[in-house]
């Protein structure tokens, strides 16, 4: 805050990880003899988190932009600590273990984030419509997962099998060949423009690339 208010600077604040602040507050609360909540957190969790997050704001003197890592205990997003934290950021990005297990990096769930900037008047109508089409296809793929796991793809209708095939291609197309990950993936890093990315998704959604195998879309 001194950098913003006294030095009149714009500040970029990284917090790794915000749950440590919650745990510290829980320990202090226990030392003070306060009755914990049902899950064991301090009764003042919401107030403490609000006080911290409200300090990360812009003023006439400068701004503070924060990027925060949030550990989700036992992958339970309803846990009071992450649930209270998620009420404050402008946007969230979720990194599920399932995608990482498939070898898809970055393991970002396209159905879970809340991007405030993904609006047609900000990114453009074409970008917005393509993103919505991708999310709808992935959502339709997510619904019959139990049927696929138990009975296999043969029990799905022709339309559903086509949706599953395109969704799997989209999943792999969402992987990115990072320069920093060359030693792990064996694939050279490369830059891909947003225009090329949008065009690629449109071709998958329209069925132009139905003849290609899933692996052809991995790290391209």
UniProtKB/Swiss-Prot annotation:
GO terms for biological process, alphabetical: proton motive force-driven mitochondrial ATP synthesis
Membrane topology designation: Peripheral membrane protein
Cellular location(s): Plastid, Chloroplast thylakoid membrane
GO cellular component: chloroplast thylakoid membrane; mitochondrion; proton-transporting ATP synthase complex
GO molecular function, a single term: ATP binding
Keywords attached to this entry: ATP synthesis, ATP-binding, CF(1), Chloroplast, Hydrogen ion transport, Ion transport, Membrane, Nucleotide-binding, Plastid, Thylakoid, Translocase, Transport
SUPFAM superfamilies in alphabetical order: C-terminal domain of alpha and beta subunits of F1 ATP synthase, P-loop containing nucleoside triphosphate hydrolases
Protein name: ATP synthase subunit beta, chloroplastic
Species annotation: Osmundastrum cinnamomeum
